[in-house]
Amino acid sequence: MKNTVWGPPEMRRIRRIHFVGIGGSGMCGIAEVLLNQGYEISGSDLKESATTRRLSDMGASITFGHTAQNIAGANVVVTSSAVAKDNPEVTAANEQRIPVIARAEMLAELMRYRHGVAIAGTHGKTTTTSLMASVLGEAGLDPTFVIGGRLNSAGTNAKLGASRYLVAEADESDASFLHLTPMVSVVTNIDADHMHTYGGDFEKLKQTFVDFLHNLPFYGVAVMCYDDPVVREIIPRVGRSVITYGFNEKADVRAVDIAQQGMQTSFTAKRPGGHPDLRISLNMPGKHNVLNALAVIAVATDEGIADEAIVSALNKFQGVGRRFQVYGNYPVDEGSVMLVDDYGHHPREVDATIKAIRDGWPEKRLVAVFQPHRYTRTRDLYEDFVQVLSKVDVLVLMDVYPAGEKEIPGADGRSLCRSIRQRGQLDPIFIERGQDVKAVLSGVLQDGDLLLTQGAGDIGAVAGVLAEGGLQ
């Protein structure tokens, strides 16, 4: 009888795989999938986290701190762009002629024998990848997925599935997404971020996205957001089949009749080729999430997935950790405050979140605690940050989370605070330490406020502490 159970070929000679920085959002998912495929996994990180504990419980051998001894027995060493070239584990691997590869190269190996769906773009990758994995799962296709955030319904950011489908984020931050060879590629948007990778040349960034799309086979498909002006600009350069999506009437898959009420955003998706309209009700606020859902509808329709599965998965979607994560309502003097935590760290992401809050909760005063992420990003997008952060009602500004970078004069939290104050729309409060947030908030919060903690650094832990200990 013909064997219908499919499994990817094993990597020859590879038994033990070591991850430097295994707790990172891009690393832990790949490690988990490989662990479930039967490989021995070891890894190192600077400190313990919920992620490292989960991997340890699954059988990974994890050490804290970086030393040459950590790579003992490894056949390959996987690193991310956050790992320094002179890291002692990387140095030892090079000396011992153990291959050292980028995380995207290992992801590419996982994708090579699968039907890969790669989600690229400056913003929206994690949510779109999560929605895509949920739709495939609802259709009974049991995908493997690797996501940069925790998919709430699965309780994890990675899973080894039984089918040929693999859904993953494609990271442009270090141009490593060029390693990937998917069957379907989505581009959500293209914005000026991680410009150090591209020598400050925006044209080079755009061309790199085109090169990424040309990694598709000639029978592959590029799914591109028509509403994003930069994505729209590069469409004529793409020598593959293209499906567009957006609010624009010229988009192939488009949304009409959009309505938002609190967390609920409903819309009608119109599709080409005689496909019936789909009425969707997302448990996520904001038009940016409608675009994320449209990308998934475009892919799912092209893949021949049943409409019932598409609608059901999108309507049931429970969100992703730290993507507009609502902790709930917490008592304050004479009332209560709604606490929301979000990962947004680029001015465009912050702006999208503010718009979603204004549309969904127009009566609420918006109190934001924002932590800038990276000195280079703060410097490069300084005026954009000043403009967008001036749109909230009350702003508590933390100092920059360095993410390994050296301080850049004039691109720190104090300077940003001063510039926002000089703009004259509000008087921000600057704090140096996360542990001071609660005390500062006690003097500003009022009944009915929406409290937003936002940033890609350790501010997520601040939100967790506030949720656990309350706001009083």
From Swiss-Prot:
SUPFAM superfamilies hit by this protein: MurCD N-terminal domain, MurD-like peptide ligases, catalytic domain, MurD-like peptide ligases, peptide-binding domain
Source organism of this protein record: Hahella chejuensis (strain KCTC 2396)
Family: Belongs to the MurCDEF family.
Keywords, sorted A to Z: ATP-binding, Cell cycle, Cell division, Cell shape, Cell wall biogenesis/degradation, Cytoplasm, Ligase, Nucleotide-binding, Peptidoglycan synthesis
EC number: 6.3.2.8
Primary residence: cytoplasm
EC main group: ligase
GO biological process: cell division; cell wall organization; peptidoglycan biosynthetic process; regulation of cell shape
List of residues binding ATP: 121-127
Localization in the cell: Cytoplasm
GO cellular component, one term: cytoplasm
GO molecular function terms listed in the Swiss-Prot or TrEMBL record: ATP binding; UDP-N-acetylmuramate-L-alanine ligase activity
UniProt function note: Cell wall formation.
Protein name, as recorded: UDP-N-acetylmuramate--L-alanine ligase
Pathway field: Cell wall biogenesis; peptidoglycan biosynthesis
Reactions performed catalytically: UDP-N-acetyl-alpha-D-muramate + L-alanine + ATP = UDP-N-acetyl-alpha-D-muramoyl-L-alanine + ADP + phosphate + H(+)
